């Protein structure tokens, strides 16, 4: 499988189109990559969606860089091409300026794929900096 080309890791910043953040794009907490991050505004239903490309179908490794400055976990559904494939819980990172990475496998189709991070509780998503897709 070769997502994005060359067998390398491809980064998709949350603040760059075609990514969609239904919260706000913010830059008030240091340590993020790029020009900002997706803040789900602590709301259920405020998701982050990424469009990623894969040259062949198969399993890819998804890395989600996040910050959760609360002491409450942020459970999330990872929806790939309309189907829930993972249900990670993003733990507290100690502050909104402390970023961590959660890693898990996701199935991708050949061509364009949508990956949506959808909160499952009223607390919403953690702040999402980017996702990276790597070959398996």
Give the label of every model feature segment.
Residues 1-136:
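Extracytoplasmic
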């Amino acid at each position: 499988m070769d997502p994005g080309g060359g067998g390398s890791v491809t980064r998709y910043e949350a603040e760059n189109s075609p990514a969609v953040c239904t919260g706000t794009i913010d830059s008030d907490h240091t340590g993020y990559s790029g020009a900002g991050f997706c803040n789900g505004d602590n709301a259920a239903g405020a998701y982050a969606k990424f469009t990623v490309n894969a040259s062949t179908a198969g399993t890819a490794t998804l890395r989600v860089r996040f910050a959760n400055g609360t002491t409450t976990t942020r459970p999330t559904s990872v929806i790939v091409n309309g189907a829930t494939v993972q249900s990670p819980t993003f733990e507290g990172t100690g502050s909104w300026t402390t970023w961590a990475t959660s890693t898990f496998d996701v199935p991708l189709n050949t061509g364009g794929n949508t990956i949506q991070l959808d909160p499952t509780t009223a607390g919403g998503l953690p702040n999402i900096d980017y996702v990276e897709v790597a070959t398996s």
